[in-house]
Structures are given as structure tokens and as C-alpha cells.
Curated annotation (Swiss-Prot):
<dbReference type="GO" id="GO:0003984">
    <property type="term" value="F:acetolactate synthase activity"/>
</dbReference>
<feature type="binding site">
    <location>
        <position position="493"/>
    </location>
    <ligand>
        <name>Mg(2+)</name>
    </ligand>
</feature>
<dbReference type="GO" id="GO:0009097">
    <property type="term" value="P:isoleucine biosynthetic process"/>
</dbReference>
<keyword id="KW-0378">Hydrolase</keyword>
<dbReference type="InterPro" id="IPR045229">
    <property type="entry name" value="TPP_enz"/>
</dbReference>
<comment type="function">
    <text>Involved in the cleavage of the C1-C2 bond of 3D-(3,5/4)-trihydroxycyclohexane-1,2-dione (THcHDO) to yield 5-deoxy-glucuronate (5DG).</text>
</comment>
<dbReference type="Pfam" id="PF00205">
    <property type="entry name" value="TPP_enzyme_M"/>
</dbReference>
<dbReference type="InterPro" id="IPR000399">
    <property type="entry name" value="TPP-bd_CS"/>
</dbReference>
<dbReference type="GO" id="GO:0000287">
    <property type="term" value="F:magnesium ion binding"/>
</dbReference>
<protein>
    <recommendedName>
        <fullName>3D-(3,5/4)-trihydroxycyclohexane-1,2-dione hydrolase</fullName>
        <ecNumber>3.7.1.22</ecNumber>
    </recommendedName>
</protein>
<feature type="binding site">
    <location>
        <position position="520"/>
    </location>
    <ligand>
        <name>Mg(2+)</name>
    </ligand>
</feature>
<dbReference type="InterPro" id="IPR012000">
    <property type="entry name" value="Thiamin_PyroP_enz_cen_dom"/>
</dbReference>
<dbReference type="GO" id="GO:0019310">
    <property type="term" value="P:inositol catabolic process"/>
</dbReference>
<dbReference type="GO" id="GO:0030976">
    <property type="term" value="F:thiamine pyrophosphate binding"/>
</dbReference>
<dbReference type="GO" id="GO:0102481">
    <property type="term" value="F:3D-(3,5/4)-trihydroxycyclohexane-1,2-dione hydrolase activity"/>
</dbReference>
<keyword id="KW-0479">Metal-binding</keyword>
<feature type="binding site">
    <location>
        <position position="66"/>
    </location>
    <ligand>
        <name>thiamine diphosphate</name>
    </ligand>
</feature>
Amino acid sequence: MAKTIRLTTAQALVKFLNAQYLHADGKEEPFVEGIFTIFGHGNVLGIGQALEQDAGRLNVWQGKNEQGMAHAAMAFSKQMLRKKIYAVTTSVGPGAANLVAAAGTALANNIPVLLLPADTFATRQPDPVLQQFEQEYSQAVTTNDALKPVSRYWDRITRPEQLMSSLIRAFEVMTDPGKAGPATICIAQDVEGEAYEYPEEFFRKRIHYLERRKPTEREIEEALERIRRSKRPLLVVGGGAKYSEAKEELVALSEQCGIPLVETQAGKATVAADFANNLGGLGVTGTLAANKAAREADLVIGVGTRYTDFATSSKTAFDFEHTTFLNINVSRMQTYKLDAYQVVADAKETLSLLISRLKTYRSAFGDRIAALKEEWLAERNRLKSVVFNRKTFVPEVKEHFSQEKLNEYADALGTELPQTTALLAINETIDEDSTIICSSGSLPGDLQRLWHANEPNTYHLEYGYSCMGYEISGALGIKLAEPEREVYSIVGDGSFLMLHSELITAIQYNKKINILLFDNAGFGCISNLQMDHGGGSYYCEFLTADNQVMNIDYAKVAEGYGAKTYRANTVEQLKAALKDAKKQETSTLIEMKVLPKTMTDGYESWWNVGVAEVAASQSIQDAYQARQAKLKEAKHY
């Protein structure tokens, strides 16, 4: 007869979380670092009681917004290269609903996080309970069903014994590099407190092995043949290469064979920006060097990439008539993209084998790599020194705003600071081992093109879901992952307004984060999109009822929370603020008023977005025709 221990469902959950370990590359560590909580009537008497009684080694943090704390949990796991996670517990109803955006963010980025929303009563005795809606077609539907499409694994616990098989399945999913993502386990609030005789063996130390899948001999031989046949192969470094920690292998293969590297947002900072063959970001937000190399390549070797529309310029980045693809990925689904030859294997293992068998191969790119890189560095230097003037200023995003309108913004915001000038001043000033985080707006494009990250894993971009509000919440997660490093949240005013609640959590627990707030008084990148496609400037600027530019004192907002704040509208003020902020022990916010339309623009790239087929505006009709013409150049699938 197996020995048992009588625990509530919630107590069993906490005990199980404490017993999970991950073994990767010879190193074994606890997999669950802790749990973020916002308690409500659905979880405070269940999971809340269990944690209060015995949290074990789990760190417990009080969040301020469910989406925010789930984003912090996701960022922690992403920064830890998916080798550790946080769990997140919420109440029923609205609290659970707030997890949907965060779950989508984790799913789009293939990041494991354990979501534990409370659910309505399994017995249904008090139905409808507080924060429960009613549907006529089913009593089994709750808010938590909205989490199904955005979870890699989803389950509902209505009996205590169901917890055992559900948790084992959830951790199998979260520790598999090929399908990692959010696991959601919804626990009925009455069941959280129900007791059960759980087998003691369920709580024994459980080790999940992160094995590096090796390619088959057939996969390697075919990959070698395709590389040897090609004259101008190109390596696309995706997020999977970063999680595989394949830096040395990428550099070695590139150097040995003369193959240029380009990066996706997720793959950036796998290889140092200063590496001679690294041509930078690819696609819509990419560099001119990378986009030119992509057009010239006859073989594209995708290493751990999903080939999103931003990376492929909506499938126009490559010469599809003459270019073939070789995809290396632990996800079989991802290897099938763009009609590629598929290698379903770990990036590091595969690249190592390729290096050992390509001793004599050299690409035909030759000196072209250095020429492309030099050309782009000259452009980067120009963007570092942009200076505004009130008579003949030409912004990077041209023909949208008149000189008069730009002058009005300069007066209203009290600034003449261009966005690219400010960003590159930051890049030059902060420590190289600092980590930056960004997610949405125009800043991800500027960062992918311009930011030089030379230390591994110091560039943390969430550009799978591009979720506004991730930046500040995520900075807290990064700080929990790397407490000794400075972390900088690079965020626009639009995203700051969407969500910044976890700044309070960072201050509360003395987890210092630095917020670099670029305020251009509006949703700048969407204004660009709107006007690039024939529209006017329509509800993307932050204007008062009498059409005046809003000048919001964001520094005062952060000061009210307890952060150390700065206002910097010149490069000199910015550098001084950055140096002083580093000395602080509490969280900081540097507010920069920057001029609109001074972010970088596209470099020989295209983004397919929906344009009205019928419109009164001739400029919109022209934009529609231009889109139709461009689609003829694109791969259709």
C-alpha cells in the first residue's frame, strides 16, 4: 500500500512545485523559482493559505496587475533561457481575464510560465458566484476558457486527484524546448481547499532532462550537400539559437566558411554586434546591410527562427525564385516554413557537426560582407548625430509633418531631441553588461537597427506578440533573473500608459529597474503606418480637445510611486542622468521628450498590411495599388 499524505489541492500544488528540477548540460537546478500572487476570493483561502503555511523554497511576490506580473514571470523565464520559471496565481473572473494578453505573449515567444487562475465552484452550489458570468448554452464555460487559445497546455481541475496527472503533463510541456510555452491549470475555488490522500511518491524530487536533440545522419548529409552547392549562404540567427546557447558555433561556422550572419529580434545578442560577419537585424526593422545580403543569398540557413513577417519583410526579403532554405529548429513545425529542407535538431549540436565537415568550404561573399557592414556603420554614425533645426529640418520619416508642425511639437514639449540621437547616446553610456528590454512602438525598430549588444543575452526584445506594457513588467522579471546587472526598460509614452504597475512592485521589494521613457506625445509608429499608406494624422497624436499637443509630466508620476526621476531633453542632460541613475539603489525613470518622426525608417524592406480597397482619398487608392504590385513579388505562403 503506497504511503499517502493528506493535503488540500492547493497545498499539494505548492509541495509539487518545490520538487521540480531541470537538468541541462550537466547542471541540475530547481525549475520553479517562485510565484507571483494577486489574491482574491477565488485563491486567497486556497493557494494563499497553502503558501502562508509552507511556501518551501519558493519566492513569493505580490503583483499589482495580473497581466503585469505574468509578463514579469515570462521575462524571467526568457532571460533565464527557459531554464527556470515563475508561477502566477490569480483570482476568478477579471483577474483571470487579465492573464489572456500575457499568455498570448508567452505563447508567441515560446516561453514557459505556469498560470494558475482560480475557477468557479466545482459543486455549482452557490452559482452564480461573484465574478462569474452565465451562458445559456453551457454552465461549464467560465472566463478561464478564454485562456485555451493562448496556452500550450490547458486544464481545469474539478477534483483534487486530477491535479497529479495535470501537473505532470504541464511540466512535460514547459520543459520541452520544441513546444515550450504557457501551461494553464484552472483550479475550482472550492477544490483548492478540498483535502485528499496524495501518494507520497508524487512529491519526490522530479528531474526534467533538457536533452540536446542531435540531427540524424541523413539530415546532416543533406544539409552539407546544400551548403556546398551554394555560393552565397546566409545564416539567420533566431531566438532558438540564443536558447541553445550556440554563440561559439555560429561564430566558428561564419568565420570558417565566410558566411554572413543576420539576426531576428529574438536572436539579437546571441552573437556580438562587433563580430565582423554580423550584419545586424533582418527585415522590416532591419539594417540595410542585412537586407541587401538577404537579397543576394542563394541559400538561407534559418537557425531557430519562426520567420515572422517582420523578419521576412512579409516574404519579400529573399529572391525566392533562386534561393533555397535550410531550417534548423527543435520544432518540426517551424522547419517546414518556406519550403525548406528540415533539420529537426538542437542548433548548437547541428552547427557543431556542420563545422567539423565543412573544413574547405568558403562562400563567395568574400569582401562583400565587410563592405556592407562598413556602409551600415556609416549610416549608424549619421543617425547618432542628427540635429534639429527650425527652418530646414528633414526627419527620418519624411513628408508626414511640416516644418511648422515639428516646430509646434518642439515648443509644446520643450525639446529639440531626435529619437535616434538619444538612443545611441544611451548605447554609448550604459555598461555593456546591462540588459535592455523593449517590446512595442517605434523603439524596437531603432533598437534592432542601431543598438550594439556585445555581451550575450543583454538584448531582451519581445517582438513575437509586441505587447504594449511588457517593457516595465518585464524589467522586473529580468532583475529577478540577474540581480547584479542593471536593467533598462526602453519604453514609449504610449506603452507606459498601457501598463506600468510593476514599477510599484519593483520599488516595493527593492528590485531596482531603470525606465528610459521616450515621449513623442502619441502612438508614433502607428502614425507612421497610417500616413505611409495615404491616411492623414488621425487620432494617433495625443492632442487636447482644442488640438494642442499634450505635455504630460511622466517623471512626476514615477516620483509619486517613489522612484528617483530625471528629465533629459538634451544629450548632455541624458548622459548625466544615466550616470547618476546607475549610482541609485532604488528604481529610476528618465523622461525624454523626443520629436515625432525622428525614429528610423525602413531600409529596402516592406510590410504587408491591410489597405482599404475602396476609399475617397486618392492617396489611399495609390497605397492600395502599390500594395497589390508588391504582393506580386512576394512568396504566397
